[in-house]
Amino acid sequence: MEKKTKINAEEGKQELSITREFDLPVELLFKAYVEADIVEEWMGTKVLKLESKKHGSYQFETTDPQGNKYRFSGVIHEFNPNRNITRTFEFENMHLGVQLEFLEFEELTNGTSQLNMRVIYESVAHRDQQLKMPFAQGLNMAHNRLQDILNKLK
């Protein structure tokens, strides 16, 4: 059965939850979020900065087919290897405000794991604005790439 990223957005709330199961050990899934070369490959973005540690920060840049550059960045507030990352996220060219993201990495079996994310937005309007974009489709495609890329590292 094909794995699919699930997004739950309750009406009137300024948060959403994201879950995805992977056929990967939890250590490898965690590595996909903290090693710059792997992040670049599955996210399709350039990593300008990635300090994978408590009080670290990150900045990524994506260029669209027309040459427009989009940057997003944040600060890492909590970092526990193979368990969780708490960070902020800001899309610098958009007016979606700063998000707070809680990423939890859960071992399901010896070779499978699950990513559980909770994202809190400044307002319901900001969350709903993001959901109007091809957010869910893009995230599912990125998670499919993550699985494919990391299959080669197993």
Role assignments for model-derived ranges:
Residues 20, 48, 72-78, 89, ...:
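Hydrophobic/aromatic beta-strand elements that line small-molecule binding cavities or substrate pockets
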Residues 1-46:
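Hydrophobic ligand-binding cavity/cleft-lining segments
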Residues 26, 77-83, 104-114:
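A short, structured loop/turn motif at beta-sheet edges
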Residues 17-18, 36-69, 82:
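Short beta-edge strand/loop motif at the mouth of beta-sheet-based domains
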Residues 92-137:
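Beta-strand/loop substructures that line and gate deep hydrophobic ligand-binding cavities in soluble
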Residues 151-154:
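Short, highly charged C-terminal tails/helix-capping segments
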Residues 13-19, 57, 71, 84, ...:
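Intrinsic-disorder/low-complexity, polar/charged segments enriched in Ser/Thr/Lys/Arg/Asp/Glu/Gln
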Residues 29-30, 39, 58-60, 76, ...:
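Hydrophobic pocket/interface hotspot
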